[in-house]
Each structure stands twice: as C-alpha cells, then as structure tokens.
C-alpha cells in the first residue's frame, strides 16, 4: 500500500493517440490527492517491435498498466508480461466493446484509431470553435443568427469557458455580456434560430469570483461598483428582467461546474430541437 506523499508508475499504452487513456486515468488519479502518478505514455503502439520497447520500460518501472489496443496478439503479450512481473493491467475500451457486442449482436471492425478519423463530426467541431472564438464577449453580433446557442449574462458567469466547452461538442456558441447602463445589442431582440440561455449566479457567488479576479490582476478593490453588493444585486435583477422580457432560458450556474452547465444547455437544446421536429 502506498503512503501519503509517495508516487507510482502509470503506464498508458495505446495504438492511437493515447488521449482516451490520459483522460480516463487523470479523472481517476485526481481522486487520490496524496499520491503522485508518474505517467509513461506510449502512443501509436501497433507492432510487436514497438511493444517490445514498451514492455522493457514497464519491466524497468513496474506499476499500473492501462491500455487501448485492438490487436489480440499485442494484448495477449502485454497481459502476459504484466502478469509475469505482477503489474496490474486493464483494457479501458475492452469491457465497453464487449458490452456493445453483447447488446448489438455484432463484432467490431477492429479499426485502429477509428475514433480519431477526420470525419464530418471533427470538421463540425473545428467550425464551431472558430465561430465561438470570433463571437466571444459580444464580438461580431451581426452574426448571432448563425449560432446554435447564444449565452448572455453579467460578468463572471462563465460565459466564455462554457462557450468553448460547447464548441468542442460541435455546437456553435456565441456569448454576449449584460452590462448595467449599456443597452443590449438589437440583434439579441430578434433572434429566431439560436437558443438563447441567460446564465445567472447569486450575488454572493459573483462577488466572491470577482474579488478573486481583481486580486489575480493585482487591481485591489478600486473598482467598488464591480464588487459592491447592491450594485451586483441590481445587475442580477436586471439580467432576470431582460430574460423574462425576451423569453430567454434561465440557468442558475451558482453551484454548477462548466461541465454541468454545458450539459444542462445541451439538454435544453435537444429538448428544443425535438419540439421543432414535425410529427
């Protein structure tokens, strides 16, 4: 058993980019704050010769071995070596593929790196990212009608990171700040195609986030209205009034992570699209 402050070797073996392994392993290791994984990433392992080098490194630094390999011979050799040196190993996609095969009654194509094929979905994500970056923070409002989603909200309601997250899912997302004393762009008043979502947070949460932002910028508390409780409360109320006036969807992000906010927006978008499908 590892003690606090110790480390362990984590070997990630993939016949593709290794991104899947990295994402999964880091999600798990984040739950163990007191031990440190030493990552060894081996991408594009597709031959016996390439695997030989990997096995040598695993033998020199035994630890947990996670892999995404489709070639049966490579899998068998890797698992045999791990068993020989008493290193636990696990196929990340194997159990998932078995579940799919059992349910669908069909075997896989066994295409290495198939999840990274440059298909229509990939180019859709690139297009969405380009659009979202061009339409961040109220820029190019004349193109808002081309969005799938338009996010509005007062300062520090996570509009930009949520936009980028959604864009990574292929959703064209623009965001427009709601600023006290400044009229909203008239384009927001007449949108037909996009889903407009108004992001809200409690005044307490906004003040906390804004104070941290000012400190990170070394700005101190000189901008009193930015963190003044009454001023912030007025901002929140104004945003709610605008949302009610224009029929925007309301989403409270006070206790939501970016991922949770994006998931809620994607559900709103899916529900809206279902309602528009003629029966």
Swiss-Prot record:
Sample GO molecular function, one term: ADP binding
InterPro entries the record matches: Kinase-pyrophosphorylase, PPDK_reg
Bilayer-crossing regions: none
Catalytic activity: N(tele)-phospho-L-histidyl/L-threonyl-[pyruvate, phosphate dikinase] + ADP = N(tele)-phospho-L-histidyl/O-phospho-L-threonyl-[pyruvate, phosphate dikinase] + AMP + H(+); N(tele)-phospho-L-histidyl/O-phospho-L-threonyl-[pyruvate, phosphate dikinase] + phosphate + H(+) = N(tele)-phospho-L-histidyl/L-threonyl-[pyruvate, phosphate dikinase] + diphosphate
Keywords, ordered alphabetically: Kinase, Nucleotide-binding, Serine/threonine-protein kinase, Transferase
EC assignment: 2.7.11.32, 2.7.4.27
Function: Bifunctional serine/threonine kinase and phosphorylase involved in the regulation of the pyruvate, phosphate dikinase (PPDK) by catalyzing its phosphorylation/dephosphorylation.
HAMAP family reported in the protein's UniProt record: PDRP
PANTHER family assigned: PYRUVATE, PHOSPHATE DIKINASE REGULATORY PROTEIN 1, CHLOROPLASTIC (PTHR31756:SF3)
Family to which the UniProt record says this protein belongs: Belongs to the pyruvate, phosphate/water dikinase regulatory protein family. PDRP subfamily.
Protein's name in the database: Putative pyruvate, phosphate dikinase regulatory protein
Organism: Rhodopseudomonas palustris (strain TIE-1)
Lineage of origin: Bacteria, Pseudomonadati, Pseudomonadota, Alphaproteobacteria, Hyphomicrobiales
